[in-house]
Amino acid sequence: MAKAKTPAVANTGAKPPYTFRTAWALLLLGVNFLVAAYYFHIIQ
């Protein structure tokens, strides 16, 4: 098989918008810890 000369992802030099997915990840992680604290009776 011949190698493709173009990359699979276009190299435009643009900064990917990681802030949106990072905000959602931190929010879900916080909710996860909140549910865990409730489950282990750390909070009532």
From Swiss-Prot:
Pfam families the UniProt entry points to: PsaX
Taxonomic superkingdom: Bacteria
Any GO BP: photosynthesis
Membrane topology qualifier: Single-pass membrane protein
GO CC terms: photosystem I; plasma membrane-derived thylakoid membrane
Keyword Cell membrane: no
Location of the protein in the cell: Cellular thylakoid membrane
Transmembrane parts of this sequence: 23-43
Keywords for the protein's UniProt record, in alphabetical order: Membrane, Photosynthesis, Photosystem I, Thylakoid, Transmembrane, Transmembrane helix
Chief localisation class: membrane
Protein family membership: Belongs to the PsaX family.
Record protein name field: Photosystem I 4.8 kDa protein
Species the sequence originates in: Trichormus variabilis (strain ATCC 29413 / PCC 7937)
